[in-house]
UniProtKB/Swiss-Prot annotation:
Protein's gene: rps19e
Name of the protein: Small ribosomal subunit protein eS19
Entries under SUPFAM superfamilies matching the protein: Winged helix' DNA-binding domain
HAMAP family per UniProt: Ribosomal_eS19
Natural source organism: Thermoplasma acidophilum (strain ATCC 25905 / DSM 1728 / JCM 9062 / NBRC 15155 / AMRC-C165)
Gene Ontology molecular function, alphabetical: RNA binding; structural constituent of ribosome
Length: 150
């Protein structure tokens, strides 16, 4: 059995984001073209499909950590604020984006609420497990060193 931990994160996130986009279970909001992803950012994201990439990355973080709340997830996507000549300070990412994506992922059936925060549902686990299995198969065709994971 291939775990998400053994698959390169960039390949997994891109694969899952394409899958989420093709399924059309997550609605891309109108404001996603104009919004910054946190107070520490100066510009909006360059990638037009950033909302699906963020959703896939959130699913991966939930898989690895078990459960996360909105505040802790926003600190995962935070950064440091450039305050000119003064010292940098830590800042959280946008909680409204995370809240929106949690609601959309709950509607799609990939995330469920728990008393400790949000966690992956069995459907979300299956999505990530199948994606990691497909990626390892693709990597094994190119490099025989990945055969041991199949």
């Amino acid at each position: 059995m291939v775990s998400v931990k053994y698959v390169p994160s960039d390949l997994l996130i891109n694969y899952v984001s394409e899958k989420l986009k093709s399924e059309k279970k997550i609605a891309e909001p109108d404001w996603s073209k104009y919004v910054k992803t946190g107070i520490s950012r100066e510009k909006s994201p360059v990638n037009r499909d950033w909302i699906y990439v963020r959703a896939a990355a959130m699913l991966r973080k939930l898989y690895i950590n078990g459960y996360l709340g909105i505040s802790r997830m926003s600190s995962e996507y935070g950064g440091k604020v450039d305050r000119g000549s003064k010292r940098y300070h830590a800042a959280q990412g946008s909680r409204s984006i995370i809240r929106y994506l949690f609601h959309e992922l709950e509607k799609a059936g990939y995330v469920q609420k728990t008393p400790k925060g949000r966690s992956l549902s069995p459907q979300g686990m299956s999505l990530l497990d199948n994606a990691s299995k497909d990626i390892i198969k693709q990597l094994a065709e190119k490099d025989p060193a990945f055969q041991k994971f199949i």
